[in-house]
């Protein structure tokens, strides 16, 4: 279980304190109350209602068809089940195209029970992050492989190799300067993600970004070894195989994140 007092709900300031104290953060996606309740009870610190639901729940080939209404529905379902974990919800594709649109979508998500919203990218998104934070809405940034940009990237590919790594470091500092309280790094080479994590004052959560991040996240279907209908990424590990039950898998995943045994080199990307 988490070293954060089991009866004490996670808060945004507590995340930063965990980083200062060197305590790894455990995050999983969830899309309904049943799984969310199990994850919350067995050591998960943060729950992400991700727009990944478009692929693993709705059966689409990308996250692009997901709407704000979809996100609000699933966020509300998950929120009803949580006692401890901090709830993060994605802004869906183009919901953050302008600060005003982002505020409308974020307001709906917070009213549904989210405690933080996640925004992909930097660039013009810095204005959106600042706009939301100035209006008391906590923001998690998402850099590296940002699935909403899959068309521009030409597929799901590792980001931040070579000179792109320095740009990623600059973007990471920029989103924190804009007010982000948390940063997800996806499909980033381990050395770059480790350096970014050392650079920043806020926690980093890795997914395919190596063990040097301040925490880890997986899509729940991947953590449980379920067939999502898509190619299995390198960074995925089936914890149900060793855990024996959903609760056991969650405990095994949480322990592996906290003791640093996951991810190992087999589940990460070199420079």
From Swiss-Prot:
Predominant place of localization: cytoplasm
GO biological process: pantothenate biosynthetic process
UniProt: 3-methyl-2-oxobutanoate binding residues: 51-52, 90, 118
Pathway annotation from the record: Cofactor biosynthesis; (R)-pantothenate biosynthesis; (R)-pantoate from 3-methyl-2-oxobutanoate: step 1/2
Cofactor binding note from Swiss-Prot or TrEMBL: Binds 1 Mg(2+) ion per subunit.
GO cellular component, one term: cytoplasm
GO terms of molecular function: 3-methyl-2-oxobutanoate hydroxymethyltransferase activity; magnesium ion binding
One Pfam family linked to the record: Pantoate_transf
Protein keywords: Cytoplasm, Magnesium, Metal-binding, Pantothenate biosynthesis, Transferase
InterPro entries assigned to the protein according to its UniProt record, in alphabetical order: Pantoate_hydroxy_MeTrfase, Pyrv/PenolPyrv_kinase-like_dom, Pyrv_kinase-like_dom_sf
Gene3D superfamilies per the UniProt record, alphabetical: Phosphoenolpyruvate-binding domains (3.20.20.60)
Subcellular location: Cytoplasm
Protein origin, superkingdom: Bacteria
NCBIfam families named among the record's database cross-references: panB, PRK00311.1
Listed PANTHER family: 3-METHYL-2-OXOBUTANOATE HYDROXYMETHYLTRANSFERASE
Family: Belongs to the PanB family.
Its job: Catalyzes the reversible reaction in which hydroxymethyl group from 5,10-methylenetetrahydrofolate is transferred onto alpha-ketoisovalerate to form ketopantoate.
Record note on quaternary structure: Homodecamer; pentamer of dimers.
Protein known as: 3-methyl-2-oxobutanoate hydroxymethyltransferase
Lineage start: Bacteria, Pseudomonadati, Pseudomonadota, Gammaproteobacteria, Lysobacterales
């Amino acid at each position: 279980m988490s070293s954060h007092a089991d009866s004490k709900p996670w808060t945004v300031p507590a995340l930063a304190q965990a980083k200062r104290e060197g305590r790894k953060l455990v995050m999983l996606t969830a899309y309904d109350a049943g799984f969310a309740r199990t994850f919350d009870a067995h050591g998960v610190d943060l729950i992400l209602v991700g727009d990944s639901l478009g692929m693993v729940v709705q059966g689409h080939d990308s996250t692009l068809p997901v709407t704000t209404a979809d996100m609000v529905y699933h966020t509300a379902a998950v929120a009803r089940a949580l006692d401890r974990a901090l709830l993060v919800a994605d802004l869906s594709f183009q919901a953050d195209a302008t600060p005003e649109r982002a505020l409308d979508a974020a307001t709906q998500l917070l009213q549904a029970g989210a405690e933080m919203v996640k925004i992909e990218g930097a660039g013009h998104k810095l204005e959106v992050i600042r706009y939301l934070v100035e209006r008391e809405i906590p923001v998690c940034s998402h850099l590296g492989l940002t699935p909403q940009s899959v068309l521009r990237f030409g597929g799901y590919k590792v980001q931040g190799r070579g000179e792109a790594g320095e740009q990623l470091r600059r973007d990471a500092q920029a989103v924190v300067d804009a007010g982000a309280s948390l940063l997800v790094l996806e499909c980033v080479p381990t050395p770059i993600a480790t350096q970014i994590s050392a650079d920043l004052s806020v926690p980093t959560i890795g997914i395919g970004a190596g063990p040097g991040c301040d925490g880890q996240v997986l899509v729940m279907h991947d953590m449980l070894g379920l067939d999502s209908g898509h190619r299995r990424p390198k960074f995925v590990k089936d914890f149900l195989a060793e855990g024996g039950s959903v609760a056991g898998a969650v405990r095994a995943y949480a322990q592996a994140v906290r003791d640093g045994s996951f991810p190992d080199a087999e589940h990460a990307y070199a420079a």
